[in-house]
Amino acid sequence: MFAADRVVGLTRADWDVTRPAPPLDTPELVLHAAAWTDVDGAEADPQEAAAVNVGGTANVAALGVPLVYFSTDYVFDGSKGEPYVEADAPSPLSAYGRTKLHGEAAAGDRSWIVRSSWLFGPTGHNFVRTMLRLGAERGEVAVVDDQRGCPTYVGHLAEAVLALAELPYGVWHVAAEGDCTWADFAEAIFEEAGIRCRVRRIGSEELQRPARRPAYSVLRSERPGVPRLPHWREGLRHCLERLEAAH
């Protein structure tokens, strides 16, 4: 559907999405990954989070070209107790979740809304890199065991997004196969990386974080044609291989 002869990556220095677009060559397709992702910070500054996640998305949509908008499992409250599908009604618990949900609306009709969850990769700030650092520094880490989701490797998600361009606009749930708690995920990271570090399982209330998180936010798709991602554990192995190759 789209000829990717040229891919242009824009940083915040090129375009702060809270402002209208600067002069650009009109693209065929925009992958809109710019977002406020500080879940707890959004509780303290919901207006700034909305400026990025809602206003910024509206500015990107104003280009008038097809758009891929990356959303989140945090648009759900976790009360369903079984995997969320595209037809389920969102009910976010946090300011972050609300801004991402409003951003879905701001993306407009010519968009693919890609809801994914617990993203991790070899670069940037994410759970895998944090656990690798803490595991190297400590003999024990405390990790919540009462939140369940689908850890999703960004490399697998990127491959799936390319396939979405052949599918109809709308909401798509694209997350790794399988699910686990954060504590399960931490133990898998240490096991795969060969790190001797004990995981102490705790409840969310012990962390006393400003933003509420859904206790169960596993995503599944009921839409035909949705790209199927590998199991989250396979994604973890790919991520660790990339990290090892970079050193």
Task: List each model region and its residues.
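Adenosine-cofactor binding site in Rossmann-like domains, unifying the SAM/SAH pocket
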Residues: 3-23
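NAD(P)H-binding glycine-rich loop region in Rossmannoid oxidoreductase-like domains
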Residues: 9, 21-52
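Catalytic helix-loop patch of NAD(P)-dependent Rossmann-fold dehydrogenases
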Residues: 44, 51-56, 75-114, 118-119
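Mid/C-terminal beta-alpha module of Rossmann-like enzyme folds, strongest
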Residues: 160, 166-211
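Conserved C-terminal active-site "lid" loop/helix of NAD(P)H-dependent oxidoreductases
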Residues: 181-187, 202-247
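NAD(P)-dependent short-chain dehydrogenase/reductase
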Residues: 105-149, 155-156
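Structural motif
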Residues: 28-29, 66, 228
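SDR active-site strand-loop-helix element
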Residues: 10, 33-34, 67-73, 77, ...
